[in-house]
Curated annotation (Swiss-Prot):
The keyword Transmembrane applies. Part of the Bam complex, which is composed of the outer membrane protein BamA, and four lipoproteins BamB, BamC, BamD and BamE. It is found in: Cell outer membrane. Keywords: Cell outer membrane, Membrane, Repeat, Signal, Transmembrane, Transmembrane beta strand. It comes from Cronobacter sakazakii (strain ATCC BAA-894). Transmembrane segments: none annotated. This is Outer membrane protein assembly factor BamA. GO terms for cellular component: Bam protein complex. PANTHER family: OUTER MEMBRANE PROTEIN ASSEMBLY FACTOR BAMA, SORTING AND ASSEMBLY MACHINERY SAMM50 PROTEIN FAMILY MEMBER. HAMAP family: OM_assembly_BamA.
Length: 804
């Protein structure tokens, strides 16, 4: 179109001029049609000036230059005596850009692409560019299977040579795959091969990855999957000859035909390593584990190359090249692998930098580094630094980049780029809890206090059954070696009867301190001391409670519901943590084991020990870690020492949002059995002096397990994927009392055997976790499908400040 205008303009110029072959001298230049563009700007675009002698070639160059400026959609050059007359039609200015009908592509993404093409508000409208954008967008829709899609640019003229630009989308529906055919396969059936594809012509209900909607990119991925399937099974000559994609007349169906040549199976004849091995030949050769006689395997070859690169990377060779050339012998069906290694230069680290840590101090991040500045680069040490930063839980994302230093042959900078998340919360207000009723809460919790890495918490709770306050602080680097120091003080006024537990009131306060000793990258040992004072009152005569009092030599009365006593205990606290999770919040891979215990020491009124073990394992089932299987367990056991029992207020409980969802908090397990008698108003019907109830008392042993399937959250933008998590789960748990005596009198009163651990409760449901500005929120809906008499269901539950 532009060349056509050039030709017309040149013809007009030639027909309107009378001069010799040598041209003429320009005495003046006049413009017609300028509106937005200044005369000076137009003159600067022209190669011709007043006083120049011009000919046909000069005029042609002038026309080209004016078109190239991007300001004009039509240019004509005429001669009027010694004056050059330039007639132009300016391109209109874009006043606004809007979109309509786009669902698959967001407005922000469209604006970015338009701006990259020079289409933005205030700029001139280039209709050729606009046409290219229309075609490009339609091509995009075709690539994702929407063949009926159309994109039209609607240009509405406005005064002063301005226009409104509106892109109107008609996306249509995605074409679905009707059938996938593979032609030429003999060793494997078509069904077996297609079962590895993402694109499917039939998707079973249980397949959460398969998709019938055609996408060109997914097809390319499936072709690579097909190629790898054959190469991993010895078919070294396998080839995909062609691929045909056919569209049904209504553009709603797709037929895919893949033509392949399988070839024969080949075995390894040997592996030969050559090149610049940087003195690590023995280690490199140990990585070439493919033995003569085994089937050729493409994945093993790739893994071997990656292992060699990682090995060299640990020694500072940041950019090694490893290429494997297969020498195929068709006569004896063997493949000899020639591995050529070029280690390249050895690099050392000039600087380690951090970007994005607006709150966290550099020192907090730098102390997690295992790679040192000025030392040889170690890729494994760099990766450990990334892993440790992720496990801190301060960041949504952590990326690392090794950048070569300009002008230096052997220096690199290591740059860690982090995106900080909200690590604290301030909360003051009134809420409603599923277990606590109306709740008044105030608290400040900051896991990265002022960017120092300190964890500081001030919390208080007031509800129907509890008044609680606590101050805690932890310094994760009390020493430069990573020994941590933490401590807390607390006060708790707990009315168990109002919490649907057995009847007693406990006012307690205490203090404890703990040192943590890192053993290696993943293991930490903890040791500490604690003190707690318990003041119990309003104790109704209950069998398990009175059994404990008897073990202390307390003469509690079974005819009174106003018994009480106090105890002061000093404890030795210990623990061990193994943490190999990929990050500190919302992990997607790895495992964590946490062992905690305490035992009373001389000077205590009680003598007991208590141990808990928590485990969690995350197993991703896709490369992007969006689909994850989570297995969790919690075990607990405690007992008395020296003939005494563990205090009943130290019992384990289960049920609620953090253990077995779908059951009321702390409701699973043994229930209170009260003594009945004159003056006691604790039961309606007593048998043999005992009265059973639905009040939970907990037990000295507990086992809880959970299987969870974490999925992408439906209808949620990728932008929020790191702050919201959805999962389907199944929970199971049991609490029991190993010291319970299932006597004949108990059986006659209809009391279950609370020493039996097989009374397992089970539930299943769905959960949503959200890292909100107020802190982590957890919502769950669960349906119990195995419960016992006295259990209380609670399908919908929520919790603040708990993640797993």
């Amino acid at each position: 179109m532009a060349m056509k205008k050039l030709l017309i303009a040149s013809l007009l110029f030639s027909s309107a001029t009378v001069y010799g072959a040598d041209g003429f001298v320009v005495k003046d230049i006049h413009f017609e049609g300028l509106q937005r563009v200044a005369v000076g700007a137009a003159l600067l675009s022209m190669p011709v000036r007043v006083g120049d002698t011009v000919n046909d070639e000069d005029i042609s160059n002038t026309i080209r230059a004016l078109f190239a400026s991007g300001n004009f959609e039509d240019v004509r050059v005429l001669r009027d005596g010694d004056t050059l007359l330039v007639q132009v039609k300016e391109r209109p200015t874009i006043a606004s850009i809007t979109f309509s009908g786009n669902k698959s592509v967001k407005d922000d993404m469209l604006k970015q692409n338009l701006e990259a093409s020079g289409v933005r508000v205030g700029e001139s409208l280039d209709r050729t560019t606009l046409s290219d954008i229309e075609k490009g967008l339609e091509d995009f829709y075709y690539s994702v299977g929407k063949y009926s899609a159309s994109v039209k640019a609607v240009v509405t003229p406005l005064p002063r040579n301005r226009v409104d630009l509106k892109l109107v989308f008609q996306e249509g529906v995605s074409a679905k795959i009707q059938q996938i055919n593979i032609v030429g396969n003999r060793a494997f059936s078509t069904e077996e091969l297609i079962s590895n594809f993402q694109l499917r012509d039939e998707v079973p209900w249980w397949n959460v990855v398969g998709d019938r909607k055609y996408q060109k990119q997914k097809l390319q991925g499936d072709l690579e999957t097909l190629r790898s399937y054959y190469l991993d099974r010895g078919y070294a000559r396998f080839n995909i000859d062609s691929t045909q994609v056919s569209l049904t007349p209504d553009k709603k169906g797709i037929y895919v035909t893949i033509n392949v040549t399988e070839g024969d199976q080949y075995k390894i004849a040997g592996v030969e390593v050559s090149g610049n091995l940087a003195g690590h030949s023995a280690e490199i050769e140990s990585l070439t584990k493919m033995q003569p006689g085994e089937l050729y395997n493409g994945t093993k070859v790739t893994r071997m190359e990656d292992d060699i690169k990682k090995l060299l990377g640990r020694y500072g060779y940041a950019y090694p090249r490893v290429q494997t050339q297969p020498e195929i012998n068709d006569a004896d069906k063997t493949v000899k692998l020639h591995v050529n290694v070029d280690s390249g230069n050895r690099f050392y680290v000039r600087k380690i930098r951090f970007e994005g840590n607006d709150t966290s101090k550099d020192a907090v991040l730098r102390r997690e580094m295992r790679q040192m500045e000025g030392a040889w680069l170690g890729s494994d040490l760099v990766d450990q630094g990334k892993e440790r930063l992720n496990r801190l839980g301060y960041f949504e994302t952590v990326d690392v980049d090794t950048q070569r230093v300009s002008g230096s042959p052997d220096q690199v900078d290591v740059v860690y780029k982090v995106k900080e998340r909200n690590t604290g919360s301030f909360n003051f207000g009134v809420g409603y809890g599923t277990e606590s009723g109306v709740s008044f809460q105030v608290g400040v919790q900051q896991d990265n206090w002022l960017g120092t890495g300190y964890s500081v918490g001030i919390n208080g709770t007031k509800n129907d059954y509890q008044t609680y306050s606590e101050f805690s602080v932890t310094n994760p680097y009390f020493t430069v070696d990573g020994v941590s120091l933490g401590g807390r003080i607390f006060y708790n006024d707990f009315k168990a009867d109002d919490a649907d537990l057995s009847s007693y009131t406990n006012k307690s306060y205490g203090v404890d301190g703990t040192l943590g000793f890192p053993v290696n990258e993943y293991n930490t040992l903890r040791l500490g001391l604690g003190y707690v004072h318990n003041d119990l009152s309003n104790m109704e005569p209950q069998v398990a409670m009175w059994r404990y009092l008897d073990s202390l030599g307390q003469s509690a009365k079974t005819t009174s519901d106003d018994n009480g006593f106090s105890a002061d205990d000093f404890t030795l606290n210990y623990g061990w943590t193994y943490n190999h999770l990929d990050r500190g919040f919302f992990p997607t891979s790895g495992s964590r084991v946490n062992l905690n215990g305490k035992v009373t020491i001389p000077g205590s009124d009680n003598e007991f020990y208590k141990v808990t073990l928590d485990t969690a394992t995350y197993v991703p089932i896709d490369d992007d870690h969006k689909w994850v299987v989570l297995g969790r367990t919690r075990w607990g056991y405690g007992d008395g020492l020296g003939g005494k029992e563990m205090p009943f207020y130290e019992n384990f409980y289960a049920g609620g949002s953090s253990t077995v969802r779908g059951f009321q908090s702390n409701n699973i397990g043994p229930k209170a059995v009260y003594y009945s008698g004159p003056g006691l108003d604790n039961c309606d019907k007593a048998v043999g002096g005992y009265c059973s109830s639905d009040d939970a008392v907990g037990g000295n042993a507990m086992g809880v397990a959970s299987l969870e399937f974490i999925t992408p959250t439906p209808f949620l933008s990728e932008k929020y994927a790191n702050s919201v998590r959805t999962s389907l789960f199944a929970d199971a748990g049991s609490v029991w009392d190993t010291n319970w005596k299932n006597t004949a009198a108990m059986r006659a009163a209809g009391v279950p055997d609370y020493s039996d651990p097989s009374n397992i409760r089970m539930s299943a449901g769905i959960a949503l976790q959200w890292m909100s500005p107020l802190g982590p929120l957890v919502f769950s809906y669960a349906q119990p499908f195995k419960k016992y008499e006295g259990d209380k269901a609670e399908q919908f539950q929520f919790n603040i400040g708990k993640t797993w």
